[in-house]
């Protein structure tokens, strides 16, 4: 599983989000800001996106991981700030295993 | 996928005997339900619309295993009834650390873990329902049941907070608190002690399974979408 696979998983999750939030579409680009300053997601949107990513990682790659652990929320830069930062975070998390 | 898309899929924990089994049988009698049950022992229900998984929910891995199996078999869930529970009628000073662990693991941790995982599936359906089981022993602060009552008081707090956290996903979370029910759970309690509990209730009688089913049906009604974070005691 490489970074491109992870980006594609995030894009699939964004597709899910956009489907139920047609008035607040998120662009499928690596520099899209997701959560935090200028991010498109509110806290509920973040929960939905995280759940969708976790589900797609399990369905497509049989990887069962929890993205929102204590480490995620204690890092200086939020791992959920943008698509590319989130992809790096997921990649490192899977690499840890 | 084995369920029809218009079927209501109900997960009931602790279905090998007692209240859990009767709850499962009740919803199997009603049309258009698929009931998924689980317990540490083999299934005692035979019905084409019933699926049973044998596992110990107090183990974290078992919760994940159960949800993976449900995702593979039905990939849908409308209702979770957290029925599984163990009781221990013992003075705090006579409660062993092992028994305390067991009560907290089964009555609280398994409910929290299963609710977390099941909610991910339930939130995809409209009008999702989660129903927890508590007991009148909690508001009565019954002496001699400190650990059991504490675990159920925690379930009541969990019910009220998750009702708020999950309402954005269209899921309601409520709890029903029966009085004494004639099941294995209380078979070892002397009658005079049960009578002492009953004497403290407004309606001085045992709770029947029909009393419980009535509340479950009420919580599950489509019209009960605004009934959320509520604890209904029987008796």
What are the residue ranges of the model-derived segments?
Chain A
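Phosphopantetheine-dependent thiolation modules in NRPS/PKS and related acyl-activating systems
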Residues: 1-41, 45-48, 60-97
